[in-house]
Design a protein with these regions (language model features):
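Anionic-ligand binding patches
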Residues: 18, 24-29, 64-216
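Short glycine-rich, Thr/Ser-proximal phosphate-binding strand/loop in the N-terminal lobe
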Residues: 48-63, 140-146
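Phosphate-coordinating loops and pocket residues in cytosolic domains that bind phosphorylated ligands
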Residues: 43, 53, 197
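N-terminal beta1-alpha1 ligand-phosphate binding loop
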Residues: 24-46
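N-terminal amphipathic/hydrophobic targeting modules at extreme N-termini
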Residues: 3-15
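Short terminal hydrophobic/aromatic SLiMs and anchors at protein ends
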Residues: 3-4, 20-22
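Cofactor-binding loop segments of dinucleotide-utilizing enzymes, especially the Rossmann-like FAD-
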Residues: 33, 54, 136
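Short loop/helix-cap segments at secondary-structure boundaries that form the rim of catalytic
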Residues: 40-43, 61, 83-84
Length: 216
C-alpha cells in the first residue's frame, strides 16, 4: 500500500471534497482496544464500526525520545490495521508518559506503579499522545500532542491507598487522571483528554481535515 503524508492542517484541508461528496459513509476503525479512547470518541459523536487492536512491538528504540515514540507507535498501529482494512478510516493513538527524557512504562505490576508514582511525586511530567489517521485513499494524517501534569507530593498513605485500588493496572506512568489520581493533580497545562488517552480537539481537526464527519 502506498501512502501520502499530511502533517500540517490548514483551513483548506477542512474543505476536503469527501466531506461533501461522499456517496456512502466509509467504515471507521479504531486501532485500539482502550475503553477510554472509545468513550472519548463518543464525546465527539463517533462510534467505531469496528475495534481492531494492532499487534505491534511497543518497545522504545535505543535513545528514542518520548515524542518520537508516541508518533512512531501511533503510525505503526494505523498502518498495521489499515493493511487489512484498506477501505476504511483507521485511527490509532499511542500515549507516552515521561519524566524528563525517561519514558515511564505501562504499570503491569504493583512494583512498576510504585516506582512510577515515586518519580512523579511532587514534580511535573509530560504526557505525549501520537495520533495517526489513514484514509480510504491511503492518505496519512498525524499529530503529536503534549500536556504538562504536576503532581502534589505523595505521602505514604496516598501511595498505599492508590496502589491498593488497582486503578494503576495497565496505565502508562502508573496512574489514571480520570480516576482516583485526579486528587493528586496540582496543575495541568494543555489537553486534559490527551492525558486520558486521546486529545479530542486535535483528533477532531485530524478527522475533519481528512473529510470524516464528526459531531453527527
Amino acid at each position: 500500500m502506498k501512502y501520502s503524508s499530511v502533517s500540517q492542517l490548514g483551513y483548506r484541508d477542512l474543505l476536503h471534497p469527501w466531506y461533501d461528496n461522499a456517496m456512502t459513509k466509509p467504515h471507521f476503525i479504531l486501532a485500539s482496544a482502550s475503553p477510554r479512547r472509545i468513550t472519548l470518541l463518543s464525546q465527539i459523536g463517533i462510534s467505531p464500526d469496528n475495534v481492531v487492536p494492532a499487534d505491534i512491538d511497543e518497545t522504545p528504540l535505543a535513545k528514542e525520545l518520548p515524542r518520537q515514540l508516541g508518533k512512531r507507535l501511533s503510525l505503526l498501529k494505523a498502518k498495521t490495521v489499515a493493511t487489512s482494512h484498506p477501505d476504511a478510516f483507521v485511527l490509532a493513538a499511542d500515549t507516552v508518559v515521561a519524566c524528563g527524557r525517561r519514558i515511564l512504562p505501562k504499570a503491569n505490576r504493583v512494583e512498576d506503579a510504585e516506582q512510577c508514582l515515586g518519580m512523579l511525586s511532587g514534580r511535573s511530567h509530560r504526557v505525549f499522545s501520537g495520533i495517526a489517521l489513514i484514509t480510504p485513499k491511503s492518505e496519512i494524517f498525524t499529530r503529536i500532542v503534549e500536556t504538562s501534569v504536576t503532581f502534589k507530593r505523595l505521602d505514604k498513605k496516598d501511595l498505599a491507598s492508590y496502589l491498593s485500588s488497582g486503578e494503576w493496572e495497565g496505565k502508562a506512568g502508573g496512574y489514571a487522571i480520570q480516576g482516583l489520581a485526579a486528587g493528586f493533580i496540582r496543575q495541568i497545562k494543555g489537553s486534559y483528554s490527551n492525558v486520558v488517552g486521546l486529545p479530542l480537539f486535535e483528533t477532531t481537526q485530524l478527522l475533519q481535515g481528512a473529510g470524516f464527519q464528526v459531531f453527527k
